[in-house]
């Protein structure tokens, strides 16, 4: 989750890079990997994510780790965002139990990382991108997969085009899932 408006698209970039690179199941030996490959990467601009994603993170049953990325450059706007980032991390880390009203409880104990930038310039942005690029490379090395091929993406496009060109199949399929016009 990014807590600076200028970084709002970073999560999408990291997700695309990570899942496209390491979201494969075939390793260098042309065998199916015995391990789960790329983790699911998702998130968004922190302030906008609070009423959807954070509900799930704080009260849902799935445990997951989160990276929080913020900027603390001394400006009032970024300081407010950075304080919100720290507050969210504390809430997710420590939680709160309310036995009288359990729907007001937050599980806590969610592993969180904080990446704090002191400025948003080419050097700090490059450093931040390099962290995630290196993570993708190390994951691929451990998993024994090629992070640079895109066979699945290409095959998906080919299969979609084949399905699209099969008009009879599409007609039958959609007639089964959509209600007829009245």
Residue ranges and their predicted role:
Residues 1-182:
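A SIS-like phosphosugar-recognition module
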């Amino acid at each position: 989750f990014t807590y600076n408006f200028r970084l709002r698209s970073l999560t999408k970039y990291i997700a695309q890079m990570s899942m496209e690179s390491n979201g494969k199941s075939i390793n260098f030996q042309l065998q199916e990997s015995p391990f789960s490959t790329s983790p699911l990467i998702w998130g968004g601009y922190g302030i906008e994510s609070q009423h959807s994603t954070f509900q799930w993170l704080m009260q849902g049953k799935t445990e997951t780790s989160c990276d929080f990325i913020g900027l603390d450059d001394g400006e009032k706007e970024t300081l407010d965002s950075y304080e919100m980032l720290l507050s969210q991390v504390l809430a997710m880390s420590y939680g709160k139990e309310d036995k009288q009203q359990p729907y007001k409880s937050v599980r806590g104990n969610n592993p969180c990382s904080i990446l704090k930038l002191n400025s948003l310039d080419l050097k700090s942005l490059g450093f931040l991108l390099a962290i995630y690029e290196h993570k993708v490379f190390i994951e691929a090395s451990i998993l024994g997969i090629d992070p640079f091929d895109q066979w699945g993406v290409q095959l998906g496009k080919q299969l979609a085009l084949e399905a699209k060109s099969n008009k009879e199949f599409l007609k039958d399929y959609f007639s089964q899932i959509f209600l007829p016009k009245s």
